[in-house]
Structures are given as structure tokens and as C-alpha cells.
Amino acid sequence: MLTFVGLGLYDAGDISVKGLEAVRASDAVFLEYYTSRLMGTTIEDLVRAYGKEVIVLARADVEQHPEPILDAAAAGDVVVLTGGDPMVSTTHMDLRLRAAARGIPTGIIHGASIQTAVCGLTGLQNYRFGKSCSVPFPQKNWFPLTPYEVVRQNLAADLHTLVYLDIQQDRYMRVGEAIDLLEEMAVRVGGSITTYIGVARAGSVSPVVRAGTADHLRGIDFGGPLHVLIVPATLHPVEQEYLEVFAGLSV
């Protein structure tokens, strides 16, 4: 059997009781650690906390060469650990489909996701979010405008946008960098963004949540990763009050 277990948002303590039971009862534990990471812990901490050896997967291990995972799941009970909630990533959906194609039973044990955590941290109503997008680090001769197009379409529909920030092997995009990139995108297509909300280290005991203009947020030290960004649409009075109280929004 192949069971996907969400680890939650920040550290080894975020796993559910049900998830921990599945890990400890398994024959093999794999960790997919490139679509999201827990910044409040280390792999060594996970091994100690869960009492099991953990095999760390590279992107190619999941997307191109998943046979060792599937072979192990065909022979016994295998757990694949993921940051956040497992099926938010299409990578995990594909692996589950591959398992089903081989007749391997699968299951999901959910974990806390940034998609819902931002609602509690910012007070934005969850049903008012549109399509999310990701801002990548630009490369030579490559500066995609798609993230801003998603934001613009959502704003036109009066919907908030959750913006994921790029994660690389040794580099994590920060709120200020993402704002600079979105502002450049907006200039190139003749648009603008009035308000941003930056969130850092959701799930930790000291998350940072700040709302305001691009210039205001550029001057704030959000601290260590992971960071995400929200571009809000028109605010409901309760949303606005929440942001004023808990994110320092000035009106």
C-alpha cells in the first residue's frame, strides 16, 4: 500500500496523530522535499521524532523514475511524506495515479496547508480566492509575465490571489523579491497592484504577517523562509479590520 502523509507547515510536530501512526507502522518511508519544505526542522529531526529511517527523494525519483517507490508499495506498506497537504501538488497526484494503474492500494492522510493557513493569518475569506500562481526566479532571457496575468484576472473578478514564491536547492524567494518582480511585470503590461500581504513562517510560533503598499512591505524584515504573498481584492469590512489589527494595514 502507498500512503501519502502531509507533514503540515513548519516542523516535526505538525504531523497528525494518524499520520505518525502510519509512519511508524510502515515498512519504508520516503520524503518528497522539493515542492515544499519544513523550515523549522531537519531531516535528522524527522528521523528522531518519527522513529523511522527516511529516504529523501529527488525530483527525478518521483516524476521520472518512481519504480522503486511503487515496487516497495506493491510489496509492503510505504509512506510518502510531503510538506503541507499531499495532493495540492500535481506531482503527488501523478504518483498516486501510477500506483493505481499497477493495482496498488493508496491512501491520503491530510496535513495543514498554506492554502488554508493564510486565511487564518490574514482574515481573508477562503471562498474569495481565485486561481493561485507562482513567481519564479527570473533567468537570462526569461522573465515570465504569467504570474501578473493571473493576479490581474483575479482582481478583475474581485478575487484574492495566493502567490507562491520560488524554492530552489539553496535559495528561497522572499517577499521583497517577489514584490519587485510583480511590480516589474505590472509595469511591462501597463498594470498596477495597490496592496500586498506578506506572510512568513506560517505554522511557526512566530509567523510574520504584514499588509500594505509595495514600498511599505519592502521596508519590512520578514525574517527567514518560507514566505508567501497575497494580492487582495476589494476587502470586506471584516477582512479589512482583521488586517488592520493583525497585519498592520493602514487605511
Swiss-Prot record:
Residues recorded as binding S-adenosyl-L-methionine, renumbered to this chain, are L9, D85, V88, S113, I114, L165, A202, H227
User: Entry's CDD domains?
Assistant: DHP5_DphB (cd11647)
Q: Which Pfam families match?
A: TP_methylase
Reaction(s) catalysed by this chain, per the record, are: 2-[(3S)-amino-3-carboxypropyl]-L-histidyl-[translation elongation factor 2] + 3 S-adenosyl-L-methionine = diphthine-[translation elongation factor 2] + 3 S-adenosyl-L-homocysteine + 3 H(+)
**InterPro entries from the UniProt entry:** 4pyrrol_Mease, 4pyrrol_Methylase_sf, 4pyrrole_Mease_sub1, 4pyrrole_Mease_sub2, Dphthn_synthase
Please provide the record's keywords in A-Z order: Methyltransferase, S-adenosyl-L-methionine, Transferase
Name the Enzyme Commission number(s) assigned to this protein: 2.1.1.98
Q: Which domain of life is it from?
A: Archaea
Which pathway does this chain act in? Protein modification; peptidyl-diphthamide biosynthesis
What GO biological process terms does the UniProt entry carry, in alphabetical order?
A: methylation; protein histidyl modification to diphthamide
Q: What class of enzyme is it?
A: transferase
Signal sequence span per UniProt? Answer: none
Alphabetically, the GO molecular function entries are:
diphthine synthase activity
How is the subunit organization of this protein annotated in UniProt?
A: Homodimer.
Name the protein family: Belongs to the diphthine synthase family.
HAMAP family membership: Diphthine_synth
Annotated NCBIfam families: dph5
Q: What's this chain's function?
A: S-adenosyl-L-methionine-dependent methyltransferase that catalyzes the trimethylation of the amino group of the modified target histidine residue in translation elongation factor 2 (EF-2), to form an intermediate called diphthine. The three successive methylation reactions represent the second step of diphthamide biosynthesis.
**Could you identify this protein by its name?**
Diphthine synthase
Provide the species name. Methanosphaerula palustris (strain ATCC BAA-1556 / DSM 19958 / E1-9c)
Q: Which gene encodes it?
A: dphB
